[in-house]
Amino acid sequence: MNAPVNTPPRPALAIARELAGQFAQTAVERDDRGGTPKAERDALRDSGLLSLVIPQAFGGQGASWHDTFAVVREFARVDSSIAHVFGFHHLMLATVRLFSRPDQWQPWFEQTARKQWFWGNALNPLDTRTVVKHFDGWCEFSGKKSFCSGASDSEMLIASAVDERAGGKLLIAAIPSGRTGISLHNDWNNIGQRQTDSGSATFERVRVEHNELLLDPGPLSTPFAALRPLIAQLHFANLFLGIAEGAFEEARQYTLKESRPWFRSSAASSAEDPYVLRHYGEFWVGLESVRLLIERAARQLDAAWAKEHALTAQERGDLALAIGTAKVAASRHGLDICNRLFEVTGARATHASLRFDRHWRNLRTQTLHDPVDYRIHELGEWALNDKRPAPSFYS
């Protein structure tokens, strides 16, 4: 009798590549349509990737942030909206891990892994229109929130409200998305990231139990808790890089198969034209430099994450510099490639059916999440004055 063969689990990146191939078949059409990518979100649920960063002790895969962001990049090459909500799902999991007690985050992790919950975002700390009203053992959230990425078709939400009784302190909670009083308006209609469901939400006397509030240690209260914004920033850097890599590859295939050399060129094909080659050489230098910066930052993040509450403020500051550097580079080189890809593909590449413009639209939209000038300012403070970035929800 033969012993049973234990098939090892498939690597997450292999699963992601298979899914990305499926997403790519409809990505152009869905970019035009907008709305909620329900079928694609369900495919993510079925894949098991929603538990990627959850430790194995709680039913997850125990992946590193390095490997989790590799999946974000894989999706971003073909569908940056899916990449964004997938990455933000894991950012929400990081939020409860960093801001709450073990008796809170551990059951949430276990249920997420077992039920393949999708987490959405209604935090937006700059939108202070949602306020708290306190009762005995519970409270109410009432008001509006903007930029609620991934909230539609989610099982859980990270939401925030201003506690005017505590001088404007921000209270953050983890609550079921379908709770009475929560309305998701599905009103996202921007030029890019059109299937991220980043529209608005209304909270009408939404009951929040005390054990759903993330109070201990709370937001940004320790160097470890202050990793949350850095995870967000590295997510964006990987998203930017993935979009740029996807744009590069689409342009490359078009140049090789469709483009024609200019009539004054002595080259037999566009692939031999010296000006086209110059552009591709510059694209390559930009992509390689960003890849190296992101690789370094991801390794530093994993090291910081492993230290947990032993992480020092200086180590956290050094990580902020590494991630900030990577994000600025990813933004600049990504926008450059997504704009200049038409220089190497030609006029016919502007045909609406190709939607090559979606790469720039998606990247331009996402890079406006927080101004790159302020990230550069922080890097300048370090370069000139030896000042590390102070923790905030954006740095």
Curated annotation (Swiss-Prot):
Keywords: Flavoprotein, FMN, Monooxygenase, Oxidoreductase. GO terms for molecular function: 3-methylbutanoyl-CoA dehydrogenase activity; flavin adenine dinucleotide binding; monooxygenase activity. The keyword Flavoprotein applies. The keyword Oxidoreductase applies. GO terms for biological process: L-leucine catabolic process. Its EC number is 1.14.14.-. It is an enzyme of class 1 (oxidoreductase). It comes from the Bacteria. Induction: Under sulfate limitation conditions, it is transcriptionally activated by the LysR-type transcriptional regulator, CysB. Disulfide bonds: none annotated. PANTHER family: ACYL-COA DEHYDROGENASE, ISOVALERYL-COA DEHYDROGENASE, MITOCHONDRIAL-RELATED. Involved in the dimethyl sulfide degradation pathway. This is Probable FMNH2-dependent monooxygenase SfnC. It comes from Pseudomonas putida. The lineage of its organism: Bacteria, Pseudomonadati, Pseudomonadota, Gammaproteobacteria, Pseudomonadales. The gene is sfnC.
